[in-house]
Amino acid sequence: MASGGGGCSASERLPPPFPGLEPESEGAVGGSEPEAGDSDTEGEDIFTGAAAVSKPQSPKRIASLLPINSGSKENGIHEEQDQEPQDLFADATVELSLDSTQNNQKKVPAKTLISLPPQEATNSSKPQPSYEELEEEEQEDQFDLTVGITDPEKIGDGMNAYVAYKVTTQTSLPMFRSKHFAVKRRFSDFLGLYEKLSEKHSQNGFIVPPPPEKSLIGMTKVKVGKEDSSSAEFLEKRRAALERYLQRIVNHPTMLQDPDVREFLEKEELPRAVGTQTLSGAGLLKMFNKATDAVSKMTINMNESDIWFEEKLQEVECEEQRLRKLHAVVETLVNHRKELALNTAQFAKSLAMLGSSEDNTALSRALSQLAEVEEKIEQLHQEQANNDFFLLAELLSDYIRLLAIVRAAFDQRMKTWQRWQDAQTTLQKKREAEARLLWANKPDKLQQAKDEIVEWESRVTQYERDFERISTVVRKEVIRFEKEKSRDFRNHVIQYLETLLHSQQQLAKYWEAFLPEAKAIS
């Protein structure tokens, strides 16, 4: 059927007429019915609704005109050498729908295997293409490009101070001017890059990786406070988060080719990013738009025709809730591990003081060495707390934000569907208005009504194409996201287990070395 913006008329899709077809197939088309014994006219009137009628041709001539299905992805007919002409198309199973101005035409079982245009195929009984096969055929998104963020540097004093990060890029891709280059970027530049990419790609269904969240308290400490351990820890956390964010951007094939990304990596100086502050006018407008979108989403009642999207959206929502709970537990673990490290350090100091005041030489030496062991264990606890944070907590935090972006892609698809439905409703109203004008015999307004109908028919076709396109993009993006998520979690969990194993091995070595000292106490 002529839906979905294929724009092709029925005559453009019709194959040549086929001789030797049975009379009852001709009658189903709605053309003129020939005499029962008139074998010379068979096949001439099978497509009377077409723009032109071809002369009868021999079966061999027809077979030479049509593409042959040789097992490739091209559509065609299966030609068998020893098969009779009347059985030439016996294996065909797809029905060909012919659109015509006559509403009483019926579907005729086609004798050829004909592929409908993409927009029409979505509305036919033909099954959706296997995106699992598409996933296997796609090449891995591997690019010879590595980005690193180092050397956070505080520039300026007071509340006007900011931190600049060195962004280093190494690549052999020809789209860049050199193979190795470095630039200085501040945090607002990273936020500005995300805003540009999100504005261009999110509306098309792409999953744009989000930057790390702002931290007003942490940045205020850096600006007005002295360089202490808490400020250094905050800067290291932000540096690592920005590096992960930028690496996800350049790993995405669509984002990497964006000129804003290349400019961010190469250009020495960038224009100051505006609207990235939370309390700015643009920031307040974004908050208002988010609230408006949330309300409008509640009013959309989408008739989901593809169960895949419904199931995936439920999976994403459930996974986001579970990750939030797990992230809260891991943060508690990090805090307890840090508290354990502090208490172990206090314990080591107390043991050292006790050993220095002990009269028994062997006991004093054993207590002093036990204090040294506890100091080493305190370092192990501190390192493991950092591993808990950077390998687990930050990974979970990243994917909580990423899942929110995935949900936003589904919401964008829903908004595109709603726009299509609204256009269909408007088109129906325009047609009803035209009918009323015809009934009221008002020819002066009739032409304007016809023009409006043509305009809205074009909009409906375009919006349907947009919906089909964003559905394809969202499906591909979700498949790609799941592959990346599995790879990230596997790598981080393995690395985390290796740190735990190393920590326990070191702990065992410390106690094995101390055991002879304890036994030597007399």
Curated annotation (Swiss-Prot):
Residues 35-45, 132-142 have a biased composition (Acidic residues). The modification Phosphoserine is found at S32, S39, S58, S72, S188, S280. Keywords: Acetylation, Cell projection, Endosome, Golgi apparatus, Lipid-binding, Membrane, Phosphoprotein, Protein transport, Transport. Residues 1-142 are annotated as: Disordered. The modification Phosphothreonine is found at T41, T48. The modification N6-acetyllysine is found at K237. It is a peripheral membrane protein. Its main location: membrane. A 1,2-diacyl-sn-glycero-3-phospho-(1D-myo-inositol-3-phosphate) binds at R186, S188, K214, R238. Gene3D superfamilies: Arfaptin homology (AH) domain/BAR domain (1.20.1270.60), Phox-like domain (3.30.1520.10). It is found in: Endosome membrane; Golgi apparatus, trans-Golgi network membrane; Early endosome membrane; Cell projection, Lamellipodium. One of its GO terms (cellular component) is endosome membrane. GO terms for biological process: early endosome to Golgi transport; intracellular protein transport; lamellipodium morphogenesis; receptor internalization; retrograde transport, endosome to Golgi. Residues 281-298 are annotated as: Membrane-binding amphipathic helix. Coiled coil: none annotated. GO terms for molecular function: phosphatidylinositol binding. InterPro entries: AH/BAR_dom_sf, PX_dom, PX_dom_sf, PX_SNX1, SNX1_BAR, Sorting_nexin_N, Vps5_C. Pfam families: PX (PF00787), Sorting_nexin (PF03700), Vps5 (PF09325). Residues 143-272 form the PX domain. Involved in several stages of intracellular trafficking. Interacts with membranes containing phosphatidylinositol 3-phosphate (PtdIns(3P)) or phosphatidylinositol 3,5-bisphosphate (PtdIns(3,5)P2). Acts in part as component of the retromer membrane-deforming SNX-BAR subcomplex. The SNX-BAR retromer mediates retrograde transport of cargo proteins from endosomes to the trans-Golgi network (TGN) and is involved in endosome-to-plasma membrane transport for cargo protein recycling. Belongs to the sorting nexin family. Predominantly forms heterodimers with BAR domain-containing sorting nexins SNX5, SNX6 and SNX32; can self-associate to form homodimers. The heterodimers are proposed to self-assemble into helical arrays on the membrane to stabilize and expand local membrane curvature underlying endosomal tubule formation. The BAR domain is able to sense membrane curvature upon dimerization. Membrane remodeling seems to implicate insertion of a N-terminal amphipathic helix (AH) in the membrane. Binds phosphatidylinositol 3-phosphate (PtdIns-(3)P) and phosphatidylinositol 3,5-bisphosphate (PtdIns-(3,5)P2) in liposome-based assays. Can bind PtdIns(3,4,5)P3 in protein:lipid overlay assays, but not in liposome-based assays. This is Sorting nexin-1. It comes from Bos taurus. The gene is SNX1.
